Amino acid sequence: MSVRRRRERRATPVTAAGLLSFYEEYEGKIKISPTIVVGAAILVSAVVAAAHIFLPAVP
């Protein structure tokens, strides 16, 4: 088998200066699962719909 030489990746000035990074992981302080976010959105929508149905509009 022949040995393949890999190209050396050269850092561009933008990425070398730290101005642009693609694979950076950011960990926020608040961690909420997507299930809770969707559930909260459905709950808020239901409360707003119930308020429109059961509470009279003030002229």
From Swiss-Prot:
Key words, A-Z: Cell membrane, Membrane, Protein transport, Translocation, Transmembrane, Transmembrane helix, Transport
InterPro entries on file: Preprot_translocase_SecG, SecG/Sec61-beta/Sbh
Keyword Cell membrane set for record: yes
The protein, known as: Preprotein translocase subunit SecG
Membrane topology summary: Single-pass membrane protein
Superkingdom: Archaea
Alphabetical list of Pfam families matching this protein: Sec61_beta (PF03911)
Task performed by this protein: Involved in protein export. The function of the beta subunit is unknown, but it may be involved in stabilization of the trimeric complex.
Residues exposed to the Extracellular side: 54-59
Family membership noted in the UniProt record: Belongs to the SEC61-beta family.
Stretches of the chain found on the membrane's Cytoplasmic side: 1-33
Keyword Protein transport: yes
Subunit structure: Component of the protein translocase complex. Heterotrimer consisting of alpha (SecY), beta (SecG) and gamma (SecE) subunits. Can form oligomers of the heterotrimer.
Taxon lineage: Archaea, Thermoproteota, Thermoprotei, Desulfurococcales, Desulfurococcaceae
Gene Ontology, cellular component aspect: plasma membrane
Transmembrane feature ranges: 34-53
Cellular compartments annotated: Cell membrane
GO biological process, one term: protein transport
